[in-house]
Design a protein with these regions (language model features):
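Sec-dependent signal peptide recognition
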Residues: 2-9
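N-terminal signal peptide c-region/cleavage motif recognized by signal peptidases
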Residues: 14-17
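Hydrophobic small-molecule pocket/channel-lining residues, especially in calycin-type beta-barrels
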Residues: 19-230
């Protein structure tokens, strides 16, 4: 729980902490697959995973973000970060998501999800968040998640008990994100994921305009050939 202890030990994080703020403003894209710690699920986590069917239950099929981790880790999708004294706005090209995170302590967090799409639909899968700056890092804490999946390919779940920390820092020309998931009901140990992003020269992100999809292409690809059935 080191990241959570670090966050709360800083006390009230107000706009005055901007003096310690890294310059995250700009458009970023994922640079490589990233890394993750060993994932050990509890009995409840394994139960949820065993009932997950990628071809049916993947929220992306319905233009719904499965989790913040899933959105950060989407290859090729641009991410716009904007900073002000009161908030950090993260605009994800994927699903046209807009994540408005207040700067402050826990009292700055509302019961509403911090993320909605450009049509005004809110997504509890992304949680409710608040943030602050510590030692040239942006630290985001999120709670109040709904059921979702931090790894849709493997059905690694999150729940309403899940708490997450996102620590963003600049290293040279690279944005480094350490994303940690805490949930004693699902994980034997916190799950830690590291991602790296490169800053682009682009000035805006394009509309994604998601439409509901399916995995028919996958089923067709893996269907037995006619000669194999004869």
């Amino acid at each position: 729980m080191a990241l959570r202890v670090l966050f709360f030990a800083t006390g009230l994080l107000t706009s005055s902490s901007l003096a310690a703020a890294p310059d995250l403003t700009g458009i970023w894209t994922l640079n490589g697959p990233g890394t993750e710690s060993e994932i050990l699920l509890t009995e409840e986590g394994l139960r949820i995973q065993s009932e997950y069917d990628l071809l049916v239950d993947d929220p992306s099929l319905f233009c719904v973000p499965a989790s913040a981790s899933r959105i950060w880790a989407n290859p090729g999708a641009r991410i716009l970060i904007q900073q002000s004294e009161e908030a950090v706005l993260i605009s994800y090209e994927l699903f046209d998501l807009r994540r408005d995170i207040p700067i402050g302590d826990e009292s700055a967090m509302t019961d509403m999800p911090s993320t909605k799409n450009i049509d005004g639909t809110y997504f509890q899968e992304m949680g409710s968040s608040f943030a602050g700056y510590v030692d040239e890092r942006l630290i985001i804490e999120s709670r109040n998640h709904s059921l979702g999946y931090i790894r849709t390919s493997r059905g690694i779940p999150q729940s309403r008990n899940t708490v997450t920390n996102e620590v963003l820092r600049i290293e040279g020309d690279t944005l480094h994100l350490t994303h940690t998931y805490f949930d004693d009901t699902l994980y034997e140990n916190p799950i830690v994921m590291d991602y790296f992003f490169r800053r682009t020269d682009e000035s805006e992100i394009t509309l994604y305009e998601c439409r509901e999809a399916n995995y028919d292409w996958f089923n067709e690809l893996n269907a037995p050939k006619e000669e194999e059935t004869q």
